[in-house]
Amino acid sequence: MKVTGKDMQLYAVTDTQWLNGRDFLEVVEEVLANGATFLQLREKNATHEEIVEKAKAIKPLAKKYGVPFVIDDDIYAAREADVDGVHIGQNDADYMTARKVLGEDKIIGMTVKTKEQAENAVRMGADYVGMGAVFHTSTKLDAKDLSRESLIELTGMMQSIPVVAIGGINYDNCDYLKGTGVDGIAVVSAIFARKDCAAATRELFIKTSELFGYKRNIIFDMDGLMIDTEPVGNMLVKTSHEKFGYKIT
């Protein structure tokens, strides 16, 4: 599966600890329906079996909205649930093992924070890289902040590999990334810690569209659902055609 820079625009990473009893799948669908362009299932306290179960439940939602969906770290869960791929950190499974287990058609993303890691990602043929941490983050307490200068240098090494900035990024600080060469932002608490995850996603989608120069037709229906003409709008057109018995040609 080919990953583009546009896919990196708004990369949502799950974390159920922020949900405070809200239904996980309902929140995930809100995020997918309101502008997330990529989704990663990342639940560090979940068992392998729980990850597979959640992934299988999310998979049809991601397909419905046309959003690439990967699992953090667990390559065997990614294979069992048959999701789009996996994201591996520097302390997780190595790229060659992941590729052997998942096959050539699956997405493999890698975390990059040093020149050596950047060179390795290019050499291995990573489908995309997550670069950072850009800011201090509670999800990775041992991560060191990557300076703006280092970020620019590392993105310059990536050739045609899409880059998403990671680590402590939110609506208020993402302007810092303009001109660094990254294609988008990965966020956790900036969406999932918000009381209204749908609104948080819409706000970030609109801001990143402007920040990274992605032009999209943004329309909202009467319920506040963002109709992104591609693919959400197409999904809604298909649904309405089926409901009223029109033929789709």
Q: Where do the model's predicted regions map?
A:
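Conserved N-terminal beta1-alpha1 strand-loop-helix module at the mouth
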Residues: 1-95, 100-128, 143-146, 153, ...
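Glycine-rich beta-strand-to-loop/alpha-helix junction loops that act as flexible
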Residues: 131, 164-169, 185-189
